[in-house]
């Protein structure tokens, strides 16, 4: 009887869990961007609240709020209406499913994924009385074993390993194999770890002590190798075998529970622009896991997949059966609800969504046993013969255990080891109650408090040397680093020589008295909480003194806080999420920079690294703050060479530095080729600061001449810029006061010429620090596609530049005038170093006038490369002018209609003149008749003359419009020559034709207005005397 022939197809089950705010997030005033409704989880973009993304998963757990502690410290819902999900809820859904699969003979795998600090370890291991999935699964397994019938013999084997930098460390072995344990492959078994220690267990207490022992070894290894646990994967494996004594059948199940490394490492290591971005192996496992999941998801969607990259990393080799193979797999994605973690949380959700599509093919693992093999020794050794290949599960048991003895012997050996550990643990607990001691504090909460160093009466030395009372390996720890003295009920600490000791965030140089719960950092980043004498202790909550507390205290002591970064405006309690994220980055990178500096010192690389906040005091051309980001300034000691690394690039280099440093510790060899050295980069230009020159005077045709400070990223003066901007004629003659305009709209549609003249740069600190350096300046204006740079100037603290550039806006738009009124010209100062290439710009995308001046306000032009678009883009603007002229023509037609009305009135008056009073006719009948006839003739003649004049004016105007329309049609039909050499003359010709057309339109309209005004005036002059 073998495996079930028909495997069961199961999708990977995906659960998501949202944790409460961390203390750091609370201090920063973070906002929650996640919501859950009916199994759906939504995340809102803090920069655009209308952008909401919704995901659906198998299980969702809201653990963010709505909870309280019971009398045992267990977190429970605060009221019946609370949707809070505690550890017991997670175990009920996930843990019991794992146990059910194990009892039925299926392999089961649990993966915890998420960024560092998102709550992965809390869900897997738990904290205090809030036990996580791993201890609950193990405890429930043994509780169920105790209830089983007599004819079943269960066997439980336990192992615990860590994967860091593609090396496997056995966390249950006190000896470290050089280069780590090896992964082997067998055609029947698949991948397995050769030499991994498997410990037989007969109760949960043994597993609990093994986890504690493994955590202690992991913490010690992390300190010795300077390898943060957040960058390693921890895998706990349980081999559970059920031997049915009455049916000669064995069921076997592998339970793998994996706490993956922080997922943010995967994204950060892909530093854009870093020549060594593919060099680090620290992140290879997590990247490969993502590639495997993506390939399997594509396969499940019916896409053609040629290869599943299981072999790309150690982790994916060991998880091959868990992903797409023989296992029932659950992935729990841990999420931070804070707005400052939005990008990482969204990335985790997308990762989990892909994993949901992966399908496994789980089978029940069974193996037949001969009746003669029911004895314990035959159980482990009975398949050495030819039948072993037919029953790989049993053969695996032989490989792992056969050479170690029978099951009973293995249990006895494990029992003796456990008793020794229990005795040592009991002794340690006694000392904790009576002696002051140091508790380690780690970035991983599960490793905090694992190490305890006791301070006995008298002097107690700390350092690398084995002769010290406290032997501490770690970055920046000297052989004799510091001394703790326990005397007369007081404990003091004093650093040796120049060794680094920090107490409560402040470096100390002399003997310092310690108080209960003081925070101590030895070397680069070995953090400890001092626990005083029993009389000093109370019912304190030590959990609040976590890794974040240490780093925030350290940052505050160095003058870095939310307020110094400008996160909160005066009188405004709402913090900017993007700036809060910068503060979080700064605090996270602080210990990494300290460690990198220490590695540089020990490896004799001669580099000094310091954190900076880019754009801390910088603003854009309108005066608004630019987006801030953390960067690392790297300086070479002696030569004063400088590099600026982005956050992502620094993190990537830090990984590579750790690999080189680890090799140095193992072999004392730190040699590496220059191109592969993470401490080296080719020289490059360095941004020193920016100066703002406000352009408002230019909008009024006024010259401005200023001396403006270049401010660096810290807001301090780097140099002073002397610049002059002068409005001028197309020929370059400066305008005088008589050309000044009060209203900038007077310049609308007109040509504006001006010159920028950079005179000199004064007091350049960059050049004061090293006389061999040089500088360049660069600036752009309005819609200019490229930045213009001055020529390089070397070895002068007050360099004269004397560079002038002539700009022209051929028809100033409203937007350009608004730009001049409200914006500044930003001039950037760049530092040059010997051996680096100066900055330059291509002139291909710059449009020039016929005089050779640089054109701005050219939004209607696409580029010289596509000159055919120039005319077509200009056409709508010309049609707008024609439309305006037609409207004015319609107005003149209204005037014409009014004049015709007056004409009718005059004719009526003439008729009335024929019916004058009879008395007047009798007195002088002949004279009256002649006078009336003469007046009528004059009125008619004047009317005819006015109509004729108006008709002629309109005729002339419409003739002009006909010419204008003809020119417009020619412009539309005209196409540029294919010869590139003829492009510039063609553009000039087109510009001249447009100018001629504009002049024609304006002159035609002006003449029409003048003619009509003259006609109206003459009509009024004649009508007024005739009406009197």
UniProtKB/Swiss-Prot annotation:
Kindly give the Gene3D superfamilies that the UniProt entry links to this protein: 2.60.200.20, Kinesin motor domain
Q: What is its main location?
A: mitochondrion
Q: Which CDD domains match?
A: FHA_KIF28P
Please state every residue range assigned to the domain named Kinesin motor.
11-358
Q: Which UniProt keywords apply?
A: ATP-binding, Coiled coil, Membrane, Mitochondrion, Motor protein, Nucleotide-binding, Transport
Protein name (Swiss-Prot/TrEMBL)? Kinesin-like protein KIF28
Question: What InterPro entries does the record point to?
Answer: FHA_dom, Kinesin-like_KIF1-typ, Kinesin_motor_CS, Kinesin_motor_dom, Kinesin_motor_dom_sf, P-loop_NTPase, SMAD_FHA_dom_sf
UniProt organism field? Mus musculus (Mouse)
Upper lineage is: Eukaryota, Metazoa, Chordata, Craniata, Vertebrata
A Pfam family of this chain: KIF1B
As for family, the record states: Belongs to the TRAFAC class myosin-kinesin ATPase superfamily. Kinesin family.
SUPFAM superfamilies linked: P-loop containing nucleoside triphosphate hydrolases, SMAD/FHA domain
* Localization of this protein: Mitochondrion membrane
Q: What does this protein do?
A: Microtubule-dependent motor protein required for mitochondrion morphology and transport of mitochondria in neuronal cells.
Q: Which regions form coiled coils? A: 873-902
